[in-house]
Amino acid sequence: MVQWYLEELGVPYEYILLDMKAGEHKQPEYLSINPMAKVPAIVDGDFKLWESGAILVYLANKYEETPISLEEQSEILQWVLFANATLGPGLFLEDKREKETPHLLKPLNEILTNKPFLLGDKLSVADIAVGSYLAYAKILVNFDFKEYPAVADYVMRLSERPAFKETIGNR
């Protein structure tokens, strides 16, 4: 998710893949970046940040998408939080998937019926957050979006982007 957004932004970065099985995320060097021992995390100069949603919003504010109004900022934050707190668990927690998915994807399908991206005609960090979870659902749990054609088209549209192919599509 974060790597995809960095590619979309064209921001130079160093990607470090931790060997989770070997416990690299629990070593003091990484714990100094993220004391929760989770990925992703970034280091930008002396600034360290963890949690994908926080990182996405930080990158948007720093490199591209700082909206003019509080309302626009809040709408972006709404979608990033929805992706991490609601959509992700609804798609990936098996005990919730069957019950939650229709309640999540039906309105999302309606929203995407009339526009190519969540906030209109241009890809935004909101699409990176939501689109990542949708793409991973297709890749990791073989989720079929056939009942949600606008969502299926959205996932296809995102997956055709070069930055997506370079990152999520390459896994």
Describe the function of each predicted region.
Residues 1-103, 109, 114-116:
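GST-like domain detector, emphasizing the conserved glutathione-binding G-site
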Residues 19, 125, 171:
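Short, solvent-exposed turn/loop segments enriched in Gly/Ser/Thr/Pro and often Arg
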Residues 71, 79-162, 167:
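GST-like fold's C-terminal all-alpha helical module
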